[in-house]
Amino acid sequence: MIVEMSQISKSFSGNQVLKNVSFTLEKGEIHALMGENGAGKSTLMKILTGIYPRDEGVVRVKGKEVAYTHPKDAEKDGIAVIHQELNILPELSVAENLFLGNEYTVGKTGWLKTKKMNEYAEQQLAELGLKVKASDRAGALSVGKQQLIEIAKALMTNADIIIMDEPTAALTDREIDTLFTVIRGLQEKGVTFVYISHRMEEIFSLCQRITVLRDGNYVSTKVIAETSFDEIVKLMVGRELGGRYPDHDLEPGAVKLAVKNVSRKNEFESVTFEVREGEIFGIAGLMGAGRSEVVESIFGYRHLHSGTIEIDQKPVVFKRPVDAIENGIAFVPEDRKTKGLIVNFSVRDNLSITNLATVSSGNMMSSTKEQALYQELVKKLGVRTSGPHQKAKSLSGGNQQKVVIAKWLGMKPKVLILDEPTRGVDVGAKKEIYTIMNELAKQGVAIIMVSSELPEIIGMSTRVAVMFEGKLMKVLDRNELSEETIMHYATGGDKHVHQ
């Protein structure tokens, strides 16, 4: 074993987050680490990499017992971490990012050997199949290319154990394929990977073993070839979840929202579709297809350059989000932490912000009404909090997303737009969010769901609009849905608009 962690325990302020957890890595394997948010995955890896000291237990790396006190100690033993939020300095060049802290200099003068650094950087990146100029500004590259730069940086420190945290969360399908090719190529050279992800399909196609944690406890380690999706889900949540998606028994009614020939220069062109009350209308497409731009324009985040929007067959103009809100449209954005929540505010305050009329008496906010709204919405959506004053930033990803959805339900929306509703959310919370969406649709809410996960699009949608390069290629009925059909149109198949 290249890594052995035995009986690891860790507490913070009396709260035990790891309880006698064991974890092993075989040389040259890709080992998935899974568990719901809050299961202890990140804490365990932070102990391995020297960010946190362990309270109890033993860590052995390459046969020797270690007690790292700093990430640099782990780096010396060949351990590197590639975080979900990449450590790229966008204004520096590609080479400067690769050599940061280890620059080639002329003696002790501090002058950089820029040419030598650039040549070596391009050589290292070429070995990963990435052809970029080392002098290019790193921030101008796609997230997928930035991720390969992070891998190259790890290899330049002679890392042979690489920990990857949600590496594909912001990548296109093509970038994911490239990343997997690189990972498999490095595996053949003996590099070992810990792969942390909620995406079950990726784990089953890439990894050899999987370790599951639950509530800070070690649950099981399985050989991928000898287990199943359902078994892993049960290990993660401690119960049978049933089907991944709710039974599809929705009965759409009258047209609630009509989008007619809407365009925005350089983003999308002549997009037309209708959404009925009581349906979940999916919008699929590859990254850059214009999906988020369309729904943000419907909500008034972006100004339309042409086209019309109708609510209940009446034309409306949204110059800003408040106009959309006043017309009964709610929006759960792709980035919940910057656009959906005020993370330093309490859960109760976040719920009150969009429901000021409900929680006010005259011109003053009523603490009693705020508490009543908090209790109603938290119960309705099953938000797990320590209390109304818990900061939103300390919630798990799934509970943060439930708060973002909950804050809109007080206004009883006619239309609910969800952009990547389960991104970064564990499998148990996904199931709960799907159930919430289904119940809202049954109550007559017209739901628009943008998602990059094709199983989610197919499992949840009544109909699906597929976009490619700013154009709506096709609206598919539920009985037409398949991954192959969606990808056909998402990659430009039949390059003309279908309705």
Curated annotation (Swiss-Prot):
Alphabetical list of CDD domains matching this protein: ABC_Carb_Monos_I, ABC_Carb_Monos_II
Catalytic EC class: translocase
Classification via SMART domains: AAA
Record has Translocase as a keyword: yes
Pfam families: ABC_tran
Sites where the protein binds ATP: G35, E36, N37, G38, A39, G40, K41, S42
Molecular function terms, GO-annotated: ABC-type D-ribose transporter activity; ATP binding; ATP hydrolysis activity
Domain of life of the source: Bacteria
EC number: 7.5.2.7
Protein localization: Cell membrane
Residue ranges of every copy of the ABC transporter domain listed in the record: 3-240, 250-494
GO cellular component, one term: plasma membrane
Topology of the protein relative to the lipid bilayer: Peripheral membrane protein
Subunit structure: The complex is composed of an ATP-binding protein (RbsA), two transmembrane proteins (RbsC) and a solute-binding protein (RbsB).
Family according to the record: Belongs to the ABC transporter superfamily. Ribose importer (TC 3.A.1.2.1) family.
Protein function: Part of the ABC transporter complex RbsABC involved in ribose import. Responsible for energy coupling to the transport system.
Protein name, entry field: Ribose import ATP-binding protein RbsA
Organism encoding this protein: Shouchella clausii (strain KSM-K16)
Gene: rbsA
